[in-house]
Curated annotation (Swiss-Prot):
Name of this protein: Sugar fermentation stimulation protein homolog
The family this protein is said to belong to: Belongs to the SfsA family.
HAMAP family xref list: SfsA
One of the record's GO molecular function terms: DNA binding
Source organism (scientific name): Synechococcus sp. (strain CC9311)
Record PANTHER family: SUGAR FERMENTATION STIMULATION PROTEIN A
């Protein structure tokens, strides 16, 4: 399935990033010279993908329910081999992307045949958390345990190794603990969504969040599965590049 288009969409508009500010906002100059303020769904530091003066792709989606008619979707970044590549920076997209990948059978070898997929299902202590995806195995599957999938958008890298997180994330720490607590009655699966095509492996971002790194290794030792899923980004689609290897420590 490598190279298969997983998501398609209307052609994005290209421009140049002028600045990002107030976490949620960025100014972009489009090719026609128009300067627009776009919504930035990624509220983190965006290490490695925030390059004022660099090329970006934005989506025009005006709606009475939205304050801004534009959304920042992709950024052109230096790749691990010294060339340039496109990265997906919209953190609202990975859950949809991974769901589409599972529905297309892209993770059948790792997850087995799947009968149903549910999103944002309550779980965890007092059911106060919501799992990104809850999978019910098909009746033909050897392992009939429910599969809890937590998705993390990943754009930071060191060389050709993708890293998550790029800042301290107490929420991410909690998710690792909750996935571990599901075992052995269910399968806990962490899916780093590698939103850049130039990486060959994934590791926890210990330098940004040492506790997350420790919890990551504890979770793996306990049986939590890690499936780093890599994608390449185009102006009108996102393609599947395969599952990458896991490095418990960089």
């Amino acid at each position: 399935m490598t190279g298969t288009s997983i998501l398609q969409f209307p052609v994005l508009s290209e421009g140049v990033l002028l600045k990002r500010y107030k976490r949620f906002l960025a100014d972009v100059e489009l090719k026609d010279g128009q300067v627009v303020t776009v919504h930035c769904a990624n509220t983190g530091p965006m290490k490695g993908v925030l390059h004022p003066g660099g090329r970006v792709r934005v989506r025009h989606a005006p709606s009475p329910k939205r304050k801004l008619a534009w959304t920042w979707e992709q950024a052109e970044i230096p790749s691990s081999d010294g060339t340039l590549c496109w990265a997906g920076i919209n953190t609202a997209l990975p859950n949809k992307l991974i769901r589409a990948l599972i529905e297309a059978g892209g993770l059948k070898d790792q997850l087995g045949p799947i009968k149903t997929i549910r999103a944002e299902v309550p779980y965890g202590l007092n059911r106060r958390s919501r799992i990104d995806l809850l999978l019910t195995p098909d009746d033909s599957a050897d392992d009939q345990r429910p599969i809890y999938v937590e998705v993390k958008n990943t754009t930071w890298s060191h060389g050709d190794v993708a890293l998550f997180p790029d800042t301290v994330t107490e929420r991410g720490q909690k998710h690792l603990e909750e996935l571990t607590a599901l075992l052995p009655d269910a399968r806990g699966v962490l899916v780093p969504c590698l939103s850049r095509p130039d990486v060959i492996a994934f590791a926890p971002g210990d330098s940004a969040d040492p506790r997350y790194g420790d919890l990551f290794r504890q979770a793996m030792a306990a049986g939590v599965e890690v499936l780093p899923c890599c994608f390449s980004f185009y102006e009108d689609q996102i393609q599947w590049e395969g599952v990458r290897t896991v490095c418990p420590r960089l």
